[in-house]
Amino acid sequence: MSAFPASPQPSAFPASPQPSAFPASPQPSASPVSPRHCVSPSSGTLPSSSSPSVSSCALRGLSSSSSALSRPPFSSFPASPAFSRRCMLTESEMGKTRSLKWLRFRCILGACLLHFCLGGSHTIGNLLPYLIGFIRNAQATSAVSYKDGLSIYAWAIICQGVGGFLGTTLEKKAGTKKTAFLGSAWMTLGLALCGVCTHDLSLFLIAYGVVTALGCGVAYPVPLAATLKLSPAEDKGWVSGLLFFARGLSVCILCPFQSFFLHQPPEVFLSLIPAPLLPYLSSVASDTASASRLSSLNGKRAAPLPSPGGERFLTDQAVLDRLPALFFVMAGVFACIQLLGVLLLVDPERTSAADEAAADAAERQKLLYEDPQGASRASAGRSSSCSASQVFASLVLTPQDICSSPSFWRLFLMLLLSWQSLFFVQLFWKVLPLYPEASLAASAAAPAPLDSLFASVVRRVPRALASASRPDPRALHAAADAWSLTGSSWSFANDFFLSCLGGLLGALCCFGRLLWGYIGGGIGYMRSTVVMNALTAPCLFALSTYALQSPQLYAACLALVHVCHGGIFSLFPSVTSDLFGHKNVGPVFSLLFAARLAAVALAAIWINIALTYGNLHMVVGALGVCHLVSIGTTFFFHPTDALPYRFPTYSP
């Protein structure tokens, strides 16, 4: 006899199933079989009949509908241990997800607080008139002028770039929170030193342009990198935009705050009141109290003395003496905000975000190997839809490859030309009306004189209130600020008006980043750079002539320039991605950052020379030509120029 039992005979499975062989309801002793064993999940066919239980399951699927309806429901089957473990894992994963969301919220909030303080370094343009006036009064000399502020801001930008490199390197060794704390403390120390060194230009350059800027640079990339590591890929766009918004918000808040602190009530409120309304508002109080208050204000404020070059400087000693205290207050407030931001900041390496990312990668790899045909079909579809330039741009390039690419040097030239106007406008936006060219432009406008408006207001006031004993409001308002001496059309302008304008310009620059990103997605990023430069050039040409005829034209011109400058931050990274591929955006743009440093260093030199031996018209004219040259550079781009010379596809 054979050692193995005989195989079942074909007669055991008749051609047509008999009703008696398959009862209507299953026996209680029969073990339930999961429906997932009836059909193979991979092929969709019935499994092999080598197992009796599987064979009976397959045949029961062919039974009548009455037998299927008589089966017990799925809930009557006992829960398997694997199902219970899956439920426990699901609850654990939900807890981890909630914890990770809280960590992301903490990290984003802390990063926003840190970037809010870092944005305070861009308010040097608002403080430049006070700084130069304080140094001139302290040294009793007229050798210092507004063009000397170019070296301060240029050193600040260069040291911020160096500090960013140091911060990235230090983060890998010391961690996120320690690096952010070190940069924040260094920045706070620099602001405190600025309060001590305001009497000397060289010392202030070291305190603000080196110490404070290095602290800003060290602390700048750390919170941004931490939030991006904790955020999923679909949220990285709005998270980075939120941090940039926090930096712009600091300019909007700090510029009016600085003016408010330096002037202090009641001076700041009286300087806000237009000249025709001063007699009516002063008559509300007693005549003697109002007259004494206005006369004391008139005695404390003196008309700024013009320099040999025609520039006007602030000479109010009561206001200038508060400048060192302002830096001490800013250092104290920033120290508290930055300490809170560092405490809220989260180190991504100590969270489970990296583990979850690794698990997701392992899951994707598992799915790839389980369905290799689907993966190959997807990759084939992607490769068929990509153009040749996109395939070449997806290559990973080395620094030597990037520097040998003609497209890299064209982008370098465009950034070098565009950044010079941004550097000049961000520093000189408040002092341009104090140049003699502004007075000439305002006199050419010939607006309605102030006396006519003043007379119309006085006629509506009872004669008893318009006594001759009160001081002349026009003379009082003219002596209030140096900007009101620009011309009759600038008579209502004062420091607080210009400070509020600076806050608005900071908000418009942030809005410009979003606007040009949206425009670039519609018409293309390279075409958007052409439109952006075409709008910026005429505004710069008119900045020293027509724009200075009135504060309204000046504000409108600066607003358009700042909106266009916002496109520099959003369009050039996108252009870099289009030319070199998303894999090379980081290395290419890191090398392109040298164009920013070279631009501010070059602009600080030639603008200083142009203002010394020329005038303001030469400076803004040259800056407008830079944007026209940038437009011409865009027509020399070619998709294959992004490839280095070592690739055979690039050789002719």
UniProtKB/Swiss-Prot annotation:
Keywords: Apicoplast, Membrane, Plastid, Pyruvate, Transmembrane, Transmembrane helix, Transport
PANTHER family given in the database record: RIBOFLAVIN TRANSPORTER RIBJ (PTHR43385:SF1)
Subcellular localization(s) per the UniProt record: Plastid, Apicoplast; Membrane
Location (main, coarse): plastid
Record keyword Transport present: yes
Membrane-protein topology: Multi-pass membrane protein
Chaperone in keyword set: no
Biological-process GO terms, alphabetical: amino acid transmembrane transport; pyruvate transmembrane transport
Protein family membership: Belongs to the major facilitator superfamily.
Role noted for this protein: Along with apicoplast pyruvate carrier 1, forms apicoplast pyruvate carrier (APC) complex, which transports pyruvate into the apicoplast and may also transport amino acids like methionine, serine, glycine and tryptophan with low efficiency. Required for maintaining pyruvate-dependent metabolic activities in the apicoplast, such as synthesis of fatty acids, isopentenyl pyrophosphate (IPP), dimethylallyl pyrophosphate (DMAPP) and methylerythritol 4-phosphate (MEP). Required for maintaining the integrity of the apicoplast. Required for normal parasite growth.
UniProt-recorded name of the protein: Apicoplast pyruvate carrier 2
Oligomeric form and interacting partners: Interacts with apicoplast pyruvate carrier 1.
Region ranges (Disordered): 1-53
GO CC annotations, alphabetized: apicoplast membrane
Cytoplasmic side of membrane: 1-45, 536-652
Transmembrane segments annotated in the record for this chain: 46-66, 126-146, 167-187, 189-209, 212-232, 278-298, 345-365, 385-405, 417-437, 445-465, 467-487, 515-535
Species in which this protein is naturally found: Toxoplasma gondii
InterPro entries: MFS_Riboflavin_Transporter (IPR052983), MFS_trans_sf (IPR036259)
